[in-house]
């Protein structure tokens, strides 16, 4: 299939908290894929989950975790490095 490709930025996406950690911020994603798929894609279609097994203490004592992106339509890819977000310990 020779569909025209398009790039799209989605800003302010909410990351679901894990059992022990919560994200400090929202995420921005860069996506690339068929124009019709990206045009129809809404923030509600995506699920961004905190990967608690990847929590690391970074520079300056900040804790970060990898974010798993689920729900991308077929043919749509995420551009850039693996998304990470600053986290804090959740309330018990």
Predicted regions and their residues:
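Structured interface patches
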Residues: 1-92
């Amino acid at each position: 299939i020779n569909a025209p490709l398009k790039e799209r930025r989605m800003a302010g996406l909410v990351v679901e908290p894990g059992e022990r950690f919560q994200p400090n911020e929202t995420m921005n994603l860069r996506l690339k894929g068929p124009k019709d798929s990206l045009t129809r894609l809404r923030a509600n279609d995506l699920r961004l989950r905190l990967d608690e097994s990847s929590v690391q203490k970074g520079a300056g004592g900040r804790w970060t975790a990898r974010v798993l992106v689920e729900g991308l339509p077929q043919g749509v890819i995420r551009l850039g490095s693996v998304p990470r977000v600053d986290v804090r310990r959740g309330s018990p």
